[in-house]
Amino acid sequence: MSVVERRQINAAINLRLSLLGLPHPDSNAESPDAILVEPLLARQRELSRRLKDRLSAPDLRIQRFLDDYLADCDEHPQLPRTTLVLDEPGLARGLSLPVDGDEFHSDIVASYRLVNGVLHNPKHDRRTTAGVFHISTGGLPIPQDKVEVDKNVYARILARAFQAPDEELALPYTANLPEQAHCWASLLMRPTVLPAVPGRTTEKSYEVHFIVPGGLMCNLDFVEGIFGNAGDPYLPENDASLDPDSWTGHTGCVILAPHLTTMTKKSLGMPHYDDATERQRRDGQCWRHEDDLYNDGKAFKVCARDERGVIVTVIADNYFGYCKKEVKTQISYSANLLGGAEEEHSGGAEVYPAWNLNQDFTDRTPDDFTLADVISTNRELLDVRPEGYAVYKPEPNIVFIPEHSHYSMRTQTISWTAHGAEQTIKLLAGKHYLSPDGYRIHAKHREMDATQWHLIGTSSRAVTCHKPATVSGGGKSEISKSISDAFVFGNAFSHDIDSAMDQVQALFDTDFTNRFADASRNGTDHRPVLSIDRSLGSVIKLLTPSIQYNDEYNAFLEGIEPDVKELAFTVKRYYLPEWGEDWRSHFTVGIMNGRHGNMVRLDGKKIITNMLRVGFREDGSWRLFTLRPDYSPAVKVQTEDDITASTVTPPWEDAEGLPRKYVTNCEHLLFQRPDDAIHRGYDKQAEFDLASGTDTFISNFEPLTHEQARDLLTDVQAYSEFTKPVRKLIERVAAMPDDQSPEFWVCSDDPRHLPDGGRSKNPRYLQVRPTDSNPELTTVADVAGKLARKLPLAGHAPQPIDVVAAGRRNNPPEDKVPALCAYNPLHYMELPELFMEYISSMTGKSPSTTGAGSEGALTKGPFNALPAVYDLNAALLSYALTDYDGWLSSAGYIGPNARVDHDISMLIPELFSHMGPNDRNTKRLISEGYLEKMQDFDFDGHRVLASRLGYRINDRFVTHYFGRIFLHPDVVFSEEMLRPELQDEKIFADSIDVIVKTHQRVAQMYFDDGTVSLACPPIRALLEIMAHGASAEGWTLDSPEFRKLFERESVLASDWYAQRLDAKQAEDVKQAEEGVERLKEYIGRSDSGSVTGRLHLADRLRELEAQLTYERSPEYRQSLVGTLGRQPRFV
């Protein structure tokens, strides 16, 4: 924050403190400005005093809910009537630190103003999930995995939440003033619940009001960064009820109250252990000793909620993660009550495959795409140049090039024919050149040699990957990270160039026509290796062993030395037809000490190769594999990170197409944990983020002084290991005098020092969403995608999900952590097996968890205020209606011996981006032998139910599809990785037993709490099979009648799906009716005239009445077919 911005924020803060009559730095100021506005402020304070009992619109909704919900209780808690309202972004940041200082300390938080942002270290450096989530009785069913709290106890907790001690109410902003301000503070936000899909849905959000003691301004700064600021709740412009089209109809409230951990159970009216029920004893809702503390004095959160759509949560801790996850919880609550929407624990990205085009490329745009059409449709957005190309006005680095143009890096030109003559422009670095179908070309230099430039071509059609239900450590965030950070660069190598080239020539002269195992295919393929009719991919397949080839040919291939084969691929990659037979003269090695070297050169320049790590050997060394020379890392546009709002509708571009899923990221800033940043120079993104900004929200790092920066600058070894942004930060801070503000900074490799002498394992910061930090890349992708679909460049054009691939964290047996390592790199599961996986959401040992177990259905267990069965019903429809295939990728380990960390997580999006829709069709993959069905087997006297793991990829799949990325795809995954049972059959069997037992244990909970009765028929039958081995009808997992329940046609024809659609129509009608009633009531008030006109409420009312008429109609009910509908009953 600049000095000017800080002064503006401070002025705004002082004004608001003055309005509340609270002390502030200008309290005694006699400046002309202060004298001028004081009478106005005095009058406003008097008006506020007379209206002190008036609640804002959202608080009125919350208070009415509490009054009714707790009507039969002894306590009747009241919301604070006066709070410091944070009605503008940035106020919380300014209030979280002293106006005249750089640090603030209380019993529960230590805060520092930094050169690179702000640092807030709460008392507890992490959240926990065990025993934290408590729910009040009297509302919707309480899941078995949550703590059930008597409604009277909840009322007493809520009442005490508003009795914060003075030290927690003290504003950090006035901490150093002679008289400190004490108050409550509040922030209104509108997180997204339903994404907008043109012609299908409008974006809808719910409202949530955070109310916190003044000493916890940093928590409001945190959530405001992630979810935004919805303004002053007292203003009609911000009253959600006056804009029904954008509101889900639901309201949340979150109260922070860290002081509640000192309450005794007895003081809350809990029963003695001898008088308690079994559930109360299990949940710790009773006492043995009079001084027993509630929840043993540990952090907890407790909420009350019912079907009316209001949820009120008290959080007895100030760690930031609880705040974020509570909003996630409430988004999920709103999505379920609204219907037609899901909140998902998911990562995701639009993945655009890319290729290294070398130095020359001729565009092959299909004939039905022309630049003339693009210009005609988007003339107002394009600056058309006389040569016949166009520049995109909103982003001038985007240049539209005519079809069939030629790009040359050698001459640095782009040429085409227009107006009967050849036109030429200079090909510039930093520009994005788009063909009429959206194919993108840009110039790039090699990583190891800035003098070597080549062209990169990027597809205009993304494969949108969605990674839901991914357990901790399963690679949720890795799906959107660029794989290029994992590259290792080298040079093309030959230990004896003359011999190698002789062998390559012999390969080129080989007759390959009789290679097939199927004799009928022999004698049909006569294409020479260097023919323009044979691609590099075709040559890689030609020289890679395969079950399609006969034994003799496979033996021949096995006998080719790897570097000879690689040289053959290299020659093919760079071969130009004009060379004719003389390809050898272009490939040489240097002369060193009078001898041939080993680095292969093309026309005198070293040929650089890219390698990728795919796991580790047992000794810890890296498994490196050479990438195809025409492969380039996919361009990724992040679409999801953690909290996703999604919907399923018929595609907005094609009313006859299969329903598709559309998603949106609910977060503006991303709460990142840079675990690897402790290794200097390794996490380049984290080092850039933490060192380059001046306004970054940071937590659980150690505050450092200017003197420590000078010390680090002189430690040349440590200093040199950092990336450039950190080195520049160190230099800048080292040059600052000790007393210059800000007095502190943080370094990416130095997490917070804890009282026990250790370091925090949970360093955190808020990262600017990549789509916002790199808007040019986002814009280019959006424009390219619209060109490919022939859409106007203006307007919202969301892309549907193409691939669904969840992630699992695998581990070998260790201490008390059981084996969970039966998966190979990539599995496909049909819906029954997939939902067994989703229901159990098993996790092994990971950096984020303390051990093995279940993270709850769809991994939402710790963040779900509702029975998980609601989410399962909707999630099932999101697959059954869309025919999405369910993939599952592995992280951590493959089998007990093959450690892979996140290497596969990073690789899977690249794989799918190079597979077309037909390639990804699992029915075809199964029928053609690319996927292997897992079979049950007997081991050590018992049946091992391996079939629950569905299908897994095999060597044929790897050779064929990974051959689009790697030069030697057949060796990327060993046989022991593709078939983990070969590593250790006992551990493999134990892993599957753990899976089956977890299925049984987790499913049983739905019977214990009775929520199985709320499951749709397919989920109910599946839970019965998981828990008891058979459904009530006697079906097993393999019964055709059972499996038919999951088929699309069966679902569409079912009564239960029809009931969901009826329930959704009824809810929409009810909300519209209530909206009409609220608008009429407001417009009819005597004091609403100016507001009615300013907000165009009469127009809104007419639109809503027309919408209500439509929603009551049979046509609206029919339009809901293909959507998720709504849970018919919640109790």
Curated annotation (Swiss-Prot):
Belongs to the PPi-type phosphoenolpyruvate carboxykinase family. It is an enzyme of class 4 (lyase). It comes from Propionibacterium freudenreichii subsp. freudenreichii. Monomer and trimer; forms heterotrimers with PEPCK2 and PEPCK3. It catalyses: oxaloacetate + diphosphate = phosphoenolpyruvate + phosphate + CO2. Its EC number is 4.1.1.38. Inorganic pyrophosphate (PPi)-dependent phosphoenolpyruvate carboxykinase, which regulates the carbon flow of the central metabolism by fixing CO(2) to phosphoenolpyruvate to produce oxaloacetate. Can also produce pyruvate and diphosphate from phosphoenolpyruvate and phosphate. GO terms for molecular function: phosphoenolpyruvate carboxykinase (diphosphate) activity. Keywords: Decarboxylase, Lyase. The keyword Lyase applies. This is PPi-type phosphoenolpyruvate carboxykinase.
